[in-house]
Amino acid sequence: MTTDDLAFDKRHIWHPYTSMTSPLPVYPVERAEGCELVLASGKRLIEGMSSWWAAIHGYNHPQLNAAMKAQIDAMSHVMFGGITHQPAVNLCRKLVAITPEPLECVFLADSGSVSVEVAMKMALQYWQARGESRQRFLTFRHGYHGDTFGAMSVCDPDNSMHSLWKGYLPENLFAPAPQSRMDGEWDESDIAPFARLMAAHRHEIAAVILEPIVQGAGGMRIYHPQWLRRIRNMCDREGILLIADEIATGFGRTGKLFACEHAGIAPDILCLGKALTGGTMTLSATLTTRQVAETISNGEAGCFMHGPTFMGNPLACAVACANLTLLESGEWRQQVASIESQLRAELAPAQSSPWVADVRVLGAIGVVETTHPVNMAALQRFFVGQGVWIRPFGKLIYLMPPYIIRPDQLRRLTQAVNDAVHNETFFSH
């Protein structure tokens, strides 16, 4: 990549959550292999983000590459309206087999945010078909569900990336974020505000939507499984649907194939994305029960009113099937358990820094929450200098490495985090 290319990028290309007047620096990557990104300079960076939590098997995995190459020769895309194909059937068969019962109807879409939009539309259309006007969603503060309009309406309205849009979005119901931690005791009083909100608005609520066990980009909080059990019971009692957004947590990230398994519950609607294709292509899936699907289909519209152009893309479905085949081997369980053990041991020293508020770990997730926002540009430059790729935001420095990472590579990541949090120059104060 030339200097001219980088100048063009800076002038014309809008990167995620980046200013066009004072953009953060970008680092040109030429290729990626295993757990490493190779910069144009030849410098290698150990990958700590799994490309926003998606590349669970690392990069250039031979089985995933082979699946894509074979599918390209047959058919890279075809519309899904009035047509079906083997990769979609194979993928949906696998998804129905591995997700909790009674989820059995699958809607394929483009991205995680769209999966959430689809789930919300399913819930709204379900109640419309039943002749009830339920138009609101109940969720937690500090939640994050995506950047599209409906998804933004169930993100924290005050403490998130979407507070700018308050007043424009539909007004949903927000309970305080869970305080009972995964590694602590369950406090029954923790759920009281949530229960009061549900009781007060039970005839308005179409669904509860939440990120099970781990709240992702809204704060990386890890909460007690009893929350999910109690909410499942409340939803059953009130006849309210439960949507589990497992876009970040699905496919083994928390040590269980799906985070709902920590509580032994099943949602009425399940959102999947990110790691669905092993981080190779964009694809998402929204699963629901036969009862929800048939209620929608028997309503006035006679069908579910959604249909993306690239729905069921054969290339994405083929590589997603290969990804699930890799997961079926079960090797990921030991990999994630080993990562968790190493993260717990090696991030513990960060707690001694005066700039650190909390350290938390679950599965292949390690989070260091700081007392002050980090200086993003300076800290990113430091990490690249250390030969690691870690992308912090706000007060969070976190690791979500590929499951195939070696202990020595993970040690480089944790050492870089420990060095950073003991250096006050990286914090705004």
Swiss-Prot record:
Cofactor(s) named in the record: pyridoxal 5'-phosphate
One term of GO molecular function: adenosylmethionine-8-amino-7-oxononanoate transaminase activity
Catalysed conversion reaction: (8S)-8-amino-7-oxononanoate + S-adenosyl-L-methionine = S-adenosyl-4-methylsulfanyl-2-oxobutanoate + (7R,8S)-7,8-diammoniononanoate
Keywords: Aminotransferase, Biotin biosynthesis, Cytoplasm, Pyridoxal phosphate, S-adenosyl-L-methionine, Transferase
One Pfam family this sequence matches: Aminotran_3
Residue(s) carrying N6-(pyridoxal phosphate)lysine: K274
Keyword Transferase assigned: yes
Highest taxon of the lineage: Bacteria
Residue positions binding pyridoxal 5'-phosphate: G112, S113, D245, P308, T309
Cross-referenced Gene3D superfamilies: Aspartate Aminotransferase, domain 1 (3.90.1150.10), Type I PLP-dependent aspartate aminotransferase-like (Major domain) (3.40.640.10)
NCBIfam families listed in its UniProt record: bioA, PRK05964.1, PRK07986.1
Role noted for this protein: Catalyzes the transfer of the alpha-amino group from S-adenosyl-L-methionine (SAM) to 7-keto-8-aminopelargonic acid (KAPA) to form 7,8-diaminopelargonic acid (DAPA). It is the only aminotransferase known to utilize SAM as an amino donor.
Protein name: Adenosylmethionine-8-amino-7-oxononanoate aminotransferase
Gene source species: Salmonella typhimurium (strain LT2 / SGSC1412 / ATCC 700720)
Gene: bioA
